[in-house]
């Protein structure tokens, strides 16, 4: 990768973001980090090679060789090794429960034997695996046993003193920690490699059931004497069988110590699963443990993310490399396995009603049609801007499911509503005529529980727009503080208390509701899904930080600046349902305000055409200019841009099929104070006005197209059913499963959807 040889402080080669320090040693620091491409948390052991002597350097590379060799569910996995001129970075699996020493210290008299048996059996299982590979650990102690609470496992770590051995041959290096080292190591004699690990296992078991080390005196000299004499006292509460096993392991003579086979077959360890981790396959020992479908989907995702091409990925896996390619592959693969196993556990333990709720609120761990992913990413090149992790994160919701909330919180990500489906468009209302009384437009989200409350207020709404979500795997809808209007929309099931905490929310808001579209709308949704497929990128909450970075740069190039992170470009401004095009765009390249001539302002006349008829006179795809002769109209245009951008963020598309030169401006200036929105003074948005017979298209910011050419084929059918969609002045639009209602009233003082009068505005509460 291009960034692989750049600086390693803060961000390792653009692959990992370093965070807080988890621990320190003589030559190394262990830091919490986040893998940028996948978002997974890892532990990074940073070793300063400038402080190492020749012997320590040898131990360092021996540790790396041994950790590459041992891959077991009860051993912390090594994902990647990054070697620089001055530092060595070991990318390791991150435990979530601390080490065993701290856990033991919380129990003065030790753990109950059933729990101690469970943990000790896992440690024995891991050491037995190492010895079968002729690897000796030589530094077994509770500090080097890490808890993985979510998996219910303990795992060995820190192979800094490990080494390969040959059966029958002795080792000579004295290493380890005093309180846990076998007598023969402390004496400096040659020793049998497996026997020293057996001694350390005895010390660990003693600590588990007694709460303190067997050999720990006031000073090292006294401790050494106790070890050499093998003097220790087992408390009376320890069972006879457990005491016998401890005695079998803590033997002064290595030849008299129990072997690992004898330990595994000891009566005290009977009836316990030696390794529950074998049920999880996490960490993934080999890519061959994955199905062909999972394997291919991960490779495809890495290729789309510019990690490497397919041949390079396969070659790295087959040769057991420990580079950024294999690290990314296994982090993605393990997430798939973890999500699948958690889902299986929830399915077995949950009631039918809970299962239904989980299905509604979760994402699938994989997909069966890789073509969906390709359509997803090619629809919006913004996902590929500058950083390699963006496309993989955008595909994350499709392949791996929703990320855990803890991850999202740690990254401090702001999520926007996920809308998987084609860009939205509107069908004009059947009738929209000016009125004389001063009224306000109410923008609200409806729910059945609060309809009665809404009815109590005498309001004459000239039209009502119902926006409907299309079914999708991304059915989580969360609030966003930075979007001034859209932050009133929140997820089904979210508490009202949390919702009320936002001080900037308007008083008249209610929750989302589920309802069924009219037959015409259902027919329309079917045709859109059949002809166009998915148009948005299905980016997940995981994409907010990195993807927003690239999008802000794109917005800057287009002449716009905002105080919030934008969503995918597919959620751009709108076109009409009838013509399939009609998307808003900046007024000019420099972001200045276009001014229309008086003849333009007065041309055409008349009221907006109805959804089923009308006589539009403008050319298909023509963008009309909205400006007035005074400074107040420029201010109104700027305010209109604020609201349009807010609507843009949730893929709310407002299109209009109007007569000749009818003006269509939205002005929220007098209704809400958008303190969080900052639009350049000369920036304005022009709404698209298209004829009913053609599929005019106007590019949005960045020039991205959201509608396929074949949308024009459905125009006739859509025109035929418009009268049904517009029945009772309700305009129904497909969103994704949920319904948003926009009630619009015209304010003659401000103007609303006015025909030939000065530029009109609508008021949003």
From Swiss-Prot:
Omega-N-methylarginine modified-residue sites: 534
Database matches in Pfam families: Pkinase
One biological process term in Gene Ontology: protein phosphorylation
Biased composition (Low complexity): 533-542
One term under GO cellular component: nucleus
Protein family per UniProt: Belongs to the protein kinase superfamily. CAMK Ser/Thr protein kinase family.
Name recorded for this polypeptide: SNF-related serine/threonine-protein kinase
């Amino acid at each position: 990768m291009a960034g692989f040889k750049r600086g390693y402080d803060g961000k390792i080669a653009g692959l990992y973001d370093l965070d807080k320090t988890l621990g320190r040693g003589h030559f190394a620091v262990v830091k919490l980090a986040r893998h940028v491409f996948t978002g997974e948390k890892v532990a990074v052991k940073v070793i300063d090679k400038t402080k190492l002597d020749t012997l320590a350097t040898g131990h360092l590379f021996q540790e790396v060789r041994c950790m590459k060799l041992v891959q077991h569910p009860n051993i912390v996995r090594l994902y990647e090794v990054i070697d620089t001129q001055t530092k060595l970075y070991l990318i390791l699996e991150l435990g979530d429960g601390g080490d065993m020493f701290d856990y033991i210290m919380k129990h003065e008299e030790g753990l109950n034997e059933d729990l101690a048996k469970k943990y000790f059996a896992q440690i024995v299982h891991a050491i037995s695996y190492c010895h079968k590979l002729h690897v000796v650990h030589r530094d077994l102690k509770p500090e080097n046993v890490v808890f993985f609470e979510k998996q219910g496992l303990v795992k060995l770590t820190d192979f800094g003193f490990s080494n390969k051995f040959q059966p029958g041959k002795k080792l000579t290096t004295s290493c380890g920690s005093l309180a846990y080292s076998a007598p023969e190591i402390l004496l400096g004699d040659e020793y049998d490699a497996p026997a020293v690990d057996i001694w350390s296992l005895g010390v660990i078991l003693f600590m588990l059931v007694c709460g303190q080390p067997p050999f720990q005196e006031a000073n090292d000299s006294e401790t050494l004497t106790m070890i050499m004499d093998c003097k220790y006292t087992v408390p009376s509460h320890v069972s006879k069988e457990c005491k016998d096993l401890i005695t079998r392991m803590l033997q002064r003579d290595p030849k008299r110590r129990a072997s690992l086979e004898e330990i595994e077959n000891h009566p005290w360890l009977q009836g316990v699963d030696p390794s529950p981790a074998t049920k999880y396959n996490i960490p993934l020992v080999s890519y061959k443990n994955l199905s062909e479908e999972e394997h291919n989907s991960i490779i495809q995702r890495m290729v789309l993310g510019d990690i490497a091409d397919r041949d390079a990925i396969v070659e790295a896996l087959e040769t057991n490399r420990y580079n950024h390619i294999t690290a990314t592959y296994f982090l993605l693969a393990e997430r798939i396995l973890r999500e699948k196993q958690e889902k299986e556990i929830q399915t077995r333990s949950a009631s039918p009603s809970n299962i239904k709720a989980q299905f509604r609120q979760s994402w699938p761990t994989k997909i069966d049609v890789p073509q969906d992913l390709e359509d997803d990413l090619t629809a919006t090149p913004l996902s590929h801007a500058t950083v390699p992790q963006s496309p993989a994160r955008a595909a994350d919701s499709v392949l791996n499911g929703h990320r855990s909330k803890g991850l999202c919180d740690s990254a401090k990500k702001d999520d926007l509503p996920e809308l998987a489906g084609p860009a939205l468009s509107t069908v004009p209302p059947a009738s929209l005529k000016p009125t004389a009384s001063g009224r306000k437009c109410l923008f609200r989200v409806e729910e059945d529980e609060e309809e009665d409350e809404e009815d109590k207020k005498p309001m004459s709404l000239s039209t009502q727009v119902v926006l409907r979500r299309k079914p999708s795997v991304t059915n989580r809808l969360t609030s966003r503080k930075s979007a001034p209007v859209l932050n009133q929309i929140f997820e089904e099931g979210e508490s009202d208390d949390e919702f009320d905490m936002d001080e900037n929310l308007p008083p008249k808001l209610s929750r989302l509701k589920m309802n069924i579209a009219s037959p015409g709308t259902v027919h329309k949704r079917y045709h859109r899904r059949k002809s166009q497929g998915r148009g948005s990128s299905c980016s997940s909450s995981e994409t907010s930080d990195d993807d927003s970075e690239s999008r802000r740069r794109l917005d800057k190039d287009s002449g716009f600046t905002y105080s919030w992170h934008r969503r995918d470009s597919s959620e751009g401004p709108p076109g009409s349902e009838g013509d399939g095009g009609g998307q808003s765009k900046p007024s000019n390249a420099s972001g200045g305000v276009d001014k229309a001539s008086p003849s333009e302002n007065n041309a055409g006349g008349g009221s907006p055409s109805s959804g089923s008829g009308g006589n539009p006179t403008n050319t298909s795809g023509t963008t009309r200019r909205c400006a007035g002769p005074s400074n107040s109209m420029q201010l109104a245009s700027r305010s209109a841009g604020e609201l349009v951008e807010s609507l843009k963020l949730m893929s709310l598309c407002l299109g209009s099929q109007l007569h000749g030169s009818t003006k269509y401006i939205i002005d929220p200036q007098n209704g809400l104070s958008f303190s969080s929105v900052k639009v350049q003074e000369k920036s304005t948005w022009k709404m698209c006005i298209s004829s009913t017979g053609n599929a005019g298209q106007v590019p949005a910011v960045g020039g991205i197209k959201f509608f396929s050419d074949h949308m024009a084929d459905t125009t006739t059918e859509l025109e035929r059913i418009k009268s049904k969609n517009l029945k009772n002045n309700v305009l129904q639009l497909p969103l994704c499963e949920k319904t948003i209602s926009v009630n619009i009233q015209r304010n003659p003082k401000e103007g609303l959807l006015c025909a030939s009068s000065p530029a009109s505005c609508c008021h949003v509460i």
